[in-house]
Amino acid sequence: MTRIAYFGPEGTFTEMALLQCQDLAARGVMAVPGVELVGAERISAPSQVAALEMVADGAADLACVPIESSVEGPVTPTLDTLGFGAPLQIFAETDLAVAFSIASPKPLDEARTVGAYPVAAAQVRAWLAANMPQAQVVPAASNAAAALDVAEGRIDAGVTTALAARMYDVPEAATGVADVADARTRFVLCGKPGPAPARTGSDCTAVVIDVPSRPGSLALAMAEFALRGVDLTRIESRPKRTVFGSYVFHFDCVGHIDDPAVGEALRALHRVCDDVRFLGSWPRPGGPGTAPVDPGDSEEWFDGLRRGER
């Protein structure tokens, strides 16, 4: 049976994302080569890093982890583990609308403490100030743990998920709580390196590059995409943890490694960068950006020139 680790415990948004992936697989919308998602065993891990390391160590076949929030930006433990840890590859992604529930058995104006995972607290800070100004915010180990803390009487209210509130049988005193409307988080399924899912025409490719320490090296790496009409949709810098002021760069681009323009850009990066770590090509329906230019017309024209045609 397939084993999929996820950033737990049960009831977190990450488990909800994994359940969504399994539902998409059951409907034939999502697939990972050589892995059966439907009916897979879900294994809770205490952190994003732990979930990914379970895959690297062979304790799980895949890991489901958050990678980017529309409010808070990159999920750095995920980026750093993919960038510096044992080689892993992204095979699929999904995203969730992120709105919280306030779990509490008492009216909100009577709550004196409200537990929140730090990332969640940052996303509902204004709502709490407006609706629960009397409540002290205390840290929770996770979104689901906030509901458990309420159920066990350690706090009066918790910023949690609807799934966790139901799981621990705590009433939802408020739902749809978020400072930013339509906030979303991307989640990815990662496994050991292998063949990428087939090109769909609506794909994402990710790499981590280490460029030489000289003027213009990052601009040159970015130009390898621009000159080929490949749309970069995300660029993140992360410290290398070796020399102060040195960084690697995470690039997401529109397209698949089997797209000629993307393949050419990756080969060029290998020539101009000190290191290139391929994080995968996978379907991303409805993702941002513009698809790579089809080189077919220019290749036909060029081949005609070689044949002496004008």
Q: Where in this protein do the model-derived segments appear?
A:
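Domain-level signature for soluble enzymes in the chorismate/prephenate branch of the shikimate pathway
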Residues: 1-310
